[in-house]
């Protein structure tokens, strides 16, 4: 058995299924590049057959990524598999991940198929996929709640058809660590050809045990791949957290005895990027990447850490990418210094034109804010609200008037399909007025279900990072905007959310 643990990141696919976490093609590409910098083994870039937008994102990532394997999810049918292969055709290393449900509940209620029909479809899908790419992963959806005898038949059959990775998901987060570990081990022991494939675990966090279950699948079950997401992002209670699984295996190498290819010094940068892109703020006490992960308030603890760090710290903050909050650039900094700082932070823009545009935004920020932190630069790049390729709305400018005893008034200039429009409105506050000014032209009809503000750094002149969550016709999206002026940040976030609603509507229309 291999002593290398493969890290399979599904932030861009399963993570994006978290309500409001939808990402644009460019946002996915930026995160994929950071995952490659992190040296993730496999990047699940999306579900190519689900929409034209997902196909384009998988295709762009397949073309850009050189070191990591790029994977697309696919249902167990020829159309989905062919679409995935087409999106992956330019990848240096391509994987198709095909799946079909195998639990009695799913087969009867969702698929309306007999076990024999499911078995045949699983075999056919792997056989077809293997003719298109060499690296095939198969997942029995709701595998943990499947009948073991039937599951063994399915997995033995798909390995015989050429599946190179067998992933056994705890789709609804029902498992308990010891039971899940034994479940994986029993499958491997009962299936005659189990040694022909890498065994993988995919655990959800509904009972708060996704990481524990995954570790049990590795230690007890002998799995050598873990599927996970940055910050544990995912639908319902989320997925197994990449940063936690990686640091558990690295910190307790004495127990697990496994090697990792991950460059852990890029973990915090990846966490920040995903948080700022999706608008999902990382809780302060989140293991490894939370703001308090290496903080000590107790006097006894502080005294111990000052004398010897290992009295209360089992890993070093700098090993996962935490650095002191320091000024990195100022208004006199040049373009080359800015470009180098982007590279140090794991940000790779697509073209020199994009670098130039980002540098101009940086200079504008530096004129307004005396101290520029890493967080400011990441927010500046992630929270750009100017209309990108394929985006309908873009922020241009905003002015407001507010005096005590009078209703605030805001005027917003923004673009719609490349043409400038001017909106103006009064409101209950400056933010309300600015968003009503936008709506006076857009008429989206969307309901705002969340509005939150987060200070990016600790000073009074900090940029505010605003998250706006909109809901319309069952679609939920988050928009993020950043600016030292909270009203401007709010307008940017609102336009970002409108762009994502538009993108989701186009995906639904494309699916028919």
UniProtKB/Swiss-Prot annotation:
Keyword Coiled coil: no
Enzyme Commission (EC) number: 2.3.3.13
InterPro entries: 2-IPM_HCS-like (IPR050073), 2-isopropylmalate_synth_dimer (IPR013709), AIPM/Hcit_synth_CS (IPR002034), Aldolase_TIM (IPR013785), LeuA/HCS_post-cat (IPR054691), LeuA_allosteric_dom_sf (IPR036230), LeuA_bact_synth (IPR005671), PYR_CT (IPR000891)
Stored Gene3D superfamilies: 1.10.238.260, 3.30.160.270, Aldolase class I (3.20.20.70)
Keywords: Amino-acid biosynthesis, Branched-chain amino acid biosynthesis, Cytoplasm, Leucine biosynthesis, Manganese, Metal-binding, Transferase
Pathway info: Amino-acid biosynthesis; L-leucine biosynthesis; L-leucine from 3-methyl-2-oxobutanoate: step 1/4
Enzyme class: transferase
Protein name stated in the entry: 2-isopropylmalate synthase
Source species taxonomy: Bacteria, Pseudomonadati, Pseudomonadota, Betaproteobacteria, Burkholderiales
Gene encoding the protein: leuA
């Amino acid at each position: 058995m291999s002593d290398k643990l493969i890290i399979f990141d599904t932030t861009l696919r399963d993570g994006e299924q978290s309500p409001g976490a939808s990402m644009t093609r460019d946002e996915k590409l930026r995160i994929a590049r950071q995952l490659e910098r992190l040296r993730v083994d496999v990047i699940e870039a999306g579900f190519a057959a689900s929409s034209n937008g997902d196909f384009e994102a998988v295709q762009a990532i397949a073309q850009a990524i050189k070191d990591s394997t790029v994977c697309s999810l696919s249902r167990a049918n020829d159309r989905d598999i062919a679409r995935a292969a087409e999106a992956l055709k330019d990848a240096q290393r391509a994987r198709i991940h095909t799946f079909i449900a195998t639990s009695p509940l799913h087969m009867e209620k969702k698929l309306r198929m007999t076990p024999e029909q499911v078995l045949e479809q699983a075999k056919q899908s792997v056989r077809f996929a293997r003719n298109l790419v060499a690296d095939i992963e198969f997942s029995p959806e709701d595998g943990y709640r499947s009948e073991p005898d039937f599951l063994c038949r399915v997995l033995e059959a798909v390995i015989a058809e050429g599946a190179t990775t067998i992933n056994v998901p705890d789709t609804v987060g029902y498992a308990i660590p010891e039971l899940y570990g034994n479940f994986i081990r029993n499958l491997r022991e009962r299936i005659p050809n189990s040694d022909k494939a890498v065994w993988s675990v995919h655990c959800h966090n509904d009972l708060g045990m996704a990481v524990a279950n995954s570790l049990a699948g590795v230690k007890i079950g002998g799995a050598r791949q873990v599927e996970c997401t940055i910050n544990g992002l995912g639908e319902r209670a989320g997925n197994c957290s990449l940063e936690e699984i990686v640091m558990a295996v690295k910190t307790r190498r004495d127990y697990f005895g496994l090697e990792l290819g991950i460059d852990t010094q890029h973990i915090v940068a990846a966490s920040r990027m995903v948080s700022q892109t999706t608008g999902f703020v990382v809780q302060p006490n989140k293991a490894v990447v939370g703001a308090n992960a290496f903080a000590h308030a107790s006097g006894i603890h502080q005294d111990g850490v000052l004398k010897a760090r290992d009295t209360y710290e089992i890993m070093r903050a700098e090993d996962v990418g935490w650095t002191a909050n320091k000024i990195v650039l100022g208004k006199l900094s040049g373009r080359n210094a800015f470009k180098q700082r982007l590279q140090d932070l794991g940000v790779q823009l697509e073209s020199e034109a994009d670098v130039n545009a980002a540098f101009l935004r940086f200079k504008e920020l530096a004129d307004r804010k005396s101290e520029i932190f890493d967080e400011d630069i990441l927010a500046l790049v992630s929270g750009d609200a100017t209309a990108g390729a394929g985006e309908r709305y873009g922020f241009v400018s905003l002015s407001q008037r507010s005096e005590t005893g009078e209703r605030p008034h805001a005027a917003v200039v923004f673009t719609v399909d490349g043409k400038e429009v001017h909106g103006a409105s009064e409101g209950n506050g400056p933010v309300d007025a600015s968003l009503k000014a936008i709506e006076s032209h857009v008429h989206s009809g969307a309901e705002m279900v969340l509005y939150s503000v987060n200070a990016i750094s600790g000073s009074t002149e900090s940029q505010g990072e605003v998250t706006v969550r909109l809901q319309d016709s069952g679609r939920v999206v988050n928009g993020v905007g950043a600016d030292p002026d909270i009203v401007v940040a709010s307008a940017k976030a609102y336009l970002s959310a409108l762009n994502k609603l538009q993108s989701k509507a186009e995906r639904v229309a494309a699916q028919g």
